[in-house]
């Protein structure tokens, strides 16, 4: 087992990474209160709700659960209200702990519920998808979607513990594993060239769910994100760099309808658009763009825009991105592999050109 600590100004919390941790009583916080509510979905619950419940009961907790519909299209205020209703019906108070058992949707909605219920209660992240394990479960971003934009309603609210059991990936569909690798590759591309090079050598093992490589990879991603969050918890500076490909990717998700492309798939295509734009601006070299494209392709990820989208479809969605300031588009781009920056007010004609290069319709 590996433990990565997220060091914040006023407190810290651990991220435990290893095999068979769901049933390890030693990784659960001592201070959970007597009542715990697990939030999950039917897909995850069939595998992991019982072992987690039994482990919590061994710790003396009174455990209940609520199951939300499965999928990005259910990351909504309605799902949030389902959690609130369950908490209120069972008379849960401020001493209750919420546990998010699932992927990024479950983690984001549960975290926002914890931030809001009675003005804040404890919550634990138990991410069961690779994308959630390396990204969304760490750092305290919680949110639900709106029909006009992704993650537009939310809060920064940190978990008290993150428990990452790499064995949960065995039951994950291959498409979901691949989608998680988009966020993994992102970390190397923006901040860690040696890690990017390690991924070039080990990506096939990760696709095959080699446990040793998975644990190293997840721990490295969590450490990179923990370091960034420690410097910039509420995304006023460096944390924005973690959004490589996301402005383009969120446009894809919103335009197609949530869930048609997985988040990681949209981020992969968006990362290629950002890389091509970086090359057009004279930063990234052609060979570096090709390296990124090859690595994404080896992870079975898309590197081009959906065939149903035109370049002009992107900008209306992109202008609603949370990084937009004073009406100016801000994009995460690459100086070189391993070094990212935030570009402000980039020429929109160049943005459109980059999208067209990455289009199936060009």
From Swiss-Prot:
Co-factor binding comment = Binds 1 divalent metal cation per subunit. Can use either Co(2+) or Zn(2+).
Pathway where this protein functions = Metabolic intermediate biosynthesis; chorismate biosynthesis; chorismate from D-erythrose 4-phosphate and phosphoenolpyruvate: step 2/7
Write the Enzyme Commission number(s) for this entry.
Answer: 4.2.3.4
Principal localisation: cytoplasm
List GO molecular-function terms, semicolon-separated.
Answer: 3-dehydroquinate synthase activity; metal ion binding; nucleotide binding
Residues the record lists as binding NAD(+): 70-75, 104-108, 128-129, 141, 150, 168-171
Catalytic function, reaction form: 7-phospho-2-dehydro-3-deoxy-D-arabino-heptonate = 3-dehydroquinate + phosphate
Instruction: List, in alphabetical order, the GO biological process terms annotated in this UniProt record.
Output: amino acid biosynthetic process; aromatic amino acid family biosynthetic process; chorismate biosynthetic process
What GO terms fall under cellular component here? cytoplasm
Q: Which cofactors, by name?
A: Co(2+); Zn(2+); NAD(+)
- Please provide the record's keywords in A-Z order: Amino-acid biosynthesis, Aromatic amino acid biosynthesis, Cobalt, Cytoplasm, Lyase, Metal-binding, NAD, Nucleotide-binding, Zinc
Q: Name one Pfam family in it.
A: DHQ_synthase
- Residue positions annotated to bind Zn(2+) are 183, 246, 263
Which InterPro entries does this chain map to? Dehydroquinate_synthase, DHQ_synth_AroB, DHQ_synth_fam, DHQS/DOIS_N, DHQS_C
Q: Where in the cell is it found?
A: Cytoplasm
Q: Which family does it belong to?
A: Belongs to the sugar phosphate cyclases superfamily. Dehydroquinate synthase family.
Entry function? Catalyzes the conversion of 3-deoxy-D-arabino-heptulosonate 7-phosphate (DAHP) to dehydroquinate (DHQ).
Under the heading NCBIfam families, the entry gives: aroB
Protein name, as recorded: 3-dehydroquinate synthase
Species in which this protein is naturally found: Mannheimia succiniciproducens (strain KCTC 0769BP / MBEL55E)
């Amino acid at each position: 087992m590996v433990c990565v600590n997220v060091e914040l100004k006023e407190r810290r919390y651990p991220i435990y990474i290893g095999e068979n941790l769901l049933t390890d009583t030693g990784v659960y916080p001592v201070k959970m209160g007597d009542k715990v509510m697990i939030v999950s979905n039917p897909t995850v619950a069939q595998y992991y709700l019982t072992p987690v419940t039994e482990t919590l009961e061994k710790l003396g907790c009174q455990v209940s659960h609520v199951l939300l519909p499965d999928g990005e299209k259910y990351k909504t205020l309605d799902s949030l209200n389902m959690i609130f209703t369950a908490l209120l019906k069972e008379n849960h108070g401020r001493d209750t702990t919420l546990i998010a058992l699932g992927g990024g949707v479950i983690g984001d909605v549960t975290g926002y519920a914890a931030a809001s219920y009675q003005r804040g209660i404890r919550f634990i992240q138990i991410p069961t998808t690779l994308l959630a394990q390396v990204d969304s479960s760490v750092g305290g971003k919680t949110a639900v979607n709106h029909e006009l934009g992704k993650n537009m309603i939310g809060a920064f609210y940190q978990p008290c513990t993150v428990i990452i059991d790499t064995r949960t990936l065995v039951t994950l569909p291959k498409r979901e594993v691949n989608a998680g690798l988009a966020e993994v590759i992102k970390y190397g591309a923006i901040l860690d060239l040696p890690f990017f090079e390690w991924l070039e050598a080990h990506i096939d093992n990760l696709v095959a769910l080699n446990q040793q490589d998975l644990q190293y990879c997840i721990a490295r991603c969590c450490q990179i994100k923990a370091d960034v969050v420690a410097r910039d918890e509420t995304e006023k500076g460096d944390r924005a760099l973690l959004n490589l490909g996301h402005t383009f990717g969120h446009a894809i998700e919103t335009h197609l309808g949530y869930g048609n492309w997985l988040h990681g798939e949209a981020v992969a295509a968006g990362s290629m658009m950002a890389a091509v734009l970086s090359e057009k601006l004279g930063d990234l070299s052609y060979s570096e763009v090709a390296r990124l494209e090859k690595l994404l392709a080896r992870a079975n990820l898309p590197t081009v825009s959906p065939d149903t989208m035109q370049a002009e479809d992107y900008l209306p969605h992109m202008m609603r991105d949370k990084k937009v300031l004073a009406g100016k588009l801000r994009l995460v781009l690459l100086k070189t592999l391993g070094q990212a920056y935030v570009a402000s007010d980039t020429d929109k004609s160049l943005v459109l050109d980059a999208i067209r290069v990455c289009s199936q319709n060009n």
